[in-house]
Curated annotation (Swiss-Prot):
One GO cellular component term noted in the UniProt record for this chain: preribosome, small subunit precursor
Function, as annotated: Involved in rRNA processing.
Gene it is expressed from: efg1
Record-linked PANTHER family: RRNA-PROCESSING PROTEIN EFG1 (PTHR33911:SF1)
Residue ranges, compositional bias (Acidic residues): 305-318
Family indicated by similarity: Belongs to the EFG1 family.
Protein's recorded name: rRNA-processing protein efg1
InterPro entries, A to Z: Efg1, EFG1_rRNA-proc
Organism in which the protein naturally occurs: Neosartorya fischeri (strain ATCC 1020 / DSM 3700 / CBS 544.65 / FGSC A1164 / JCM 1740 / NRRL 181 / WB 181) (Aspergillus fischerianus)
């Protein structure tokens, strides 16, 4: 290879490397450095652990069962026990609330969508009637007939929003597929779909509204819908208020059952002990009775033998 060609090749390679270095190291022509995305820190929920709270409650109860515990330490532990039990109840209630929200989220969404659609339709109809050129009497009559439907639609809409989150949700609407005729309807309107999903109120067919519906209507008048949704209202809690005395009654019944079981067990033990003592006494009493009977039979047999001996001796003697 000639030297000139090698020098040209080297010069070309040096120029490419220098151009790359210039492109990399230069401030004007170089590409901007990629910035690292700074992710915000995740919000960590500092919820207590249920197992940890239960463990603490067991430890405190075990400590309170000690007889030699000082009075001041006992007071401190009793306060701690009350606090742990309250934290446990709050955590269980929070978990139950989140579970019920996840369970009925989609059903509530569909009901809210249908209720808002009905309410908007009725309000549009009311505006059309009020802007129409009808007589005052006819207009008044139609608006009065429409006012009841609007009120029911407003209650339905608030029912879907402010239903208590901690209770089982009872749906208001049921979806039905409405099929269309295939003959002249398709020829006239070919762009319309064959089936349409229609949501209808359940209590229109059954004639019975859910029990919470009346509570929502009353809360609309009182302005306590938020309390109803959070379950802080006496009427809205329903199940909670009924569950609390039932739990107390069940606790009392369990305590009574345990006391009766303990009494029955002690009575059984005492009956067993008395039965054993009676059996031992009967055995002791039966032993001398048997011995007396045996002795009587023995003496009677001996007397009979003596009589026989005397008679035999007299018979053979002459």
């Amino acid at each position: 290879m000639p030297r000139e060609f090698s020098r040209e090749k080297r010069s070309a390679s040096d120029s490419t490397t220098t151009s790359k270095r210039k492109y990399r190291e230069g401030s004007e022509d170089s590409l901007p450095a990629k910035k690292k995305k700074i992710h915000p820190p995740k919000h960590e929920h500092n919820h207590p652990s249920v197992n940890e709270l239960k463990k603490r409650i067991r430890d405190v109860k075990r400590l309170l069962n000690r007889v030699d515990l000082p009075a001041d330490a006992r007071i401190v532990q009793e306060r701690a026990l009350a606090g742990y039990e309250k934290d446990l109840d709050d955590e269980l209630a929070r978990r139950h609330r989140s579970q019920m929200i996840k369970k009925y989220h989609f059903v509530r969404f569909l009901d809210r969508k249908a209720a808002s659609k009905d309410l908007k339709r009725l309000l549009r109809r009311e505006q059309e009637i009020s802007n129409s050129d009808l007589d005052r009497a006819a207009k008044k009559e139609k608006l009065a007939a429409l006012a009841g439907k609007i009120h029911a639609a407003q209650v339905n809409h608030n029912y879907t929003i402010y239903y208590p989150l901690t209770q089982k949700y009872v749906a208001l609407y049921a979806e039905q597929k409405k099929k269309k005729k295939e003959s002249s309807a398709q020829s006239e309107k070919p762009n319309e779909p064959e089936a349409e999903v229609v949501s209808k109120l359940i209590y229109d067919t059954t004639g019975e509204r859910p029990p919470v519906w009346r509570v929502v209507e009353k809360c609309m008048e009182d302005g306590t819908l938020d309390l109803l949704r959070e379950g802080k209202l006496d009427d809205g809690e329903g199940e909670k208020s009924s569950q609390a005395p039932e739990q107390k009654k069940s606790k009392k019944s369990t305590d009574d059952d345990q006391s009766t079981r303990n009494k029955s067990s002690t009575e059984k033990v005492s009956d067993k002990a008395s039965g054993k003592s009676r059996k031992s006494g009967d055995k002791q009493d039966s032993k001398p009775k048997r011995s007396a009977a045996m002795e009587g039979a023995y003496w009677s047999a001996n007397e009979h033998d003596n009589d026989d001996n005397e008679s035999d001796g007299g018979f053979f003697e002459e």
